[in-house]
């Protein structure tokens, strides 16, 4: 949104009759330059200054070159499509400029002014697959449209004459665009605007400084420390007889958000940041890592192929179509040395030979009040094996942290 200036005091256009025509002419020139950015804001300004009223279509339109700011030239983003939808024909047809998988060059598509036909043309041109079997037809979420700010859109009127994102997996995911890119997320509960910085595209990892507050961390610690117990893991096929400490040596406690109003506020903050509703979240898993304690490389989502011998796990994840999509990892202490979060496959690296190796990959240092946001699912709804990550051993100090897991579907 482009805000030109603060709204001036209301005035009558007839107070200065000699200048009214000139004012309208000047505003018309401005219209040519900025109407593509926010036509509704421009109409409001014109109406305020001149007293004139305009129909909803007077300045309607969209500059499709603005869609290019969301394009990445690094690699295809499977299941993420950028669309600029423009009603351009008197007979009501739609012109669509699409960036398939978030990449250039653009593709031109036409459809009738009809949502069903628009979807048909998009499915054909963007090669959106149909559900592959009865299980997929029952459990897979349909693709969905969102604004670039993360608001879901469902009607043709909602997506016409603007830029929208299409996610085949049905949930919003922030585009990484490029490493170092900064996205401003507006109106995050308890924080106002926050900056989401891209740390990695494969897997998709962001960071946000100063996301938590000291008083919130104090409350979390006070409610959790006496309840900490050795951490557990969900064992995959073939590992049923092994101890959790083979991989993980921290202590942990799931802290219910009902324990304090501050936790409810953080839940809303996470929802505002990720653009996924609160009812998709698990309670935060509070963690303590003392010196030498660690968590070997693992994924936070549950791959179907690793749990074929566990019917209860498969049922709980809708046979792969319901899963942990996002981890918002909270850092609640500074650590003098060690305790990094590592992504060994960052940049598309092969699977490491050792799940204990902390020498290679993207390493994020613990920093109090900071969070990292990483995605375990791709925009097409599939799990991302590149999201493999681990907690490196703490070498000096104590690391307090928290896992806030956000699922792609509402929690039961």
What is each stretch, according to the model?
Residues 2-412:
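Fe(II)/2-oxoglutarate oxygenase catalytic core
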């Amino acid at each position: 949104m482009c805000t030109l200036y603060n709204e001036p005091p209301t005035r009558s256009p007839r107070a200065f009759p000699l200048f009214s025509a000139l004012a309208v002419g000047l505003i018309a020139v401005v219209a040519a330059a900025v109407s593509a950015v926010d036509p509704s804001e421009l109409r409001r300004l014109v109406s305020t200054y001149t007293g004139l009223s305009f129909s909803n279509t007077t300045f309607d339109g969209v500059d499709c070159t603005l869609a290019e700011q969301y394009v990445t030239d690094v690699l295809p983003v499977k299941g993420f499509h950028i669309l600029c939808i423009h009603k351009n024909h008197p007979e009501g047809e739609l012109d669509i400029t699409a960036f398939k998988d978030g990449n250039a060059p653009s593709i031109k598509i036409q459809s009738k002014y009809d949502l069903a036909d628009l979807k048909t043309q998009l499915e054909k041109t963007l090669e959106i697959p149909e559900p592959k079997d009865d299980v997929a037809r029952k459990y897979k979420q349909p693709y969905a449209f969102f604004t670039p700010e993360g608001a879901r859109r469902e009607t043709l009127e909602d997506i016409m004459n603007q830029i929208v994102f299409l996610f085949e997996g049905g949930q919003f995911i922030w585009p990484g665009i490029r490493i170092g890119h900064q996205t401003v997320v507006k109106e995050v509960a308890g924080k106002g605007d926050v900056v989401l910085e891209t740390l990695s595209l494969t897997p998709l990892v962001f960071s946000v400084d100063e996301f938590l507050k000291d008083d919130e961390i104090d409350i979390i610690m006070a409610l959790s420390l006496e309840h900490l117990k050795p951490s557990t893991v969900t064992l995959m096929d073939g590992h049923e007889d092994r101890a959790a400490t083979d991989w993980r040596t921290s202590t942990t406690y799931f802290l219910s958000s009902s324990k304090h109003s501050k936790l409810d506020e953080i839940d809303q903050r996470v929802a505002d940041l990720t653009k996924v509703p609160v009812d998709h979240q698990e309670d935060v898993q509070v963690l303590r890592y003392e010196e030498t304690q660690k968590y070997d490389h693992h994924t936070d989502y549950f791959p179907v192929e690793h749990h074929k011998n566990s019917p209860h796990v498969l049922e709980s994840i809708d046979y792969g179509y319901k899963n942990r999509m996002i981890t918002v990892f909270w850092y609640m202490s500074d650590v003098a040395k060690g305790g990094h979060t590592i992504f060994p496959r960052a940049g598309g690296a092969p699977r490491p030979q050792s799940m204990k190796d902390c020498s290679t990959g993207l390493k994020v240092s613990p920093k109090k009040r900071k969070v990292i946001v990483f995605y375990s699912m791709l925009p097409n709804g599939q799990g991302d094996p590149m999201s493999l990550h681990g907690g490196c051993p703490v070498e000096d100090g104590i690391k307090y942290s928290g896992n806030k897991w956000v699922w792609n579907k509402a929690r039961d």
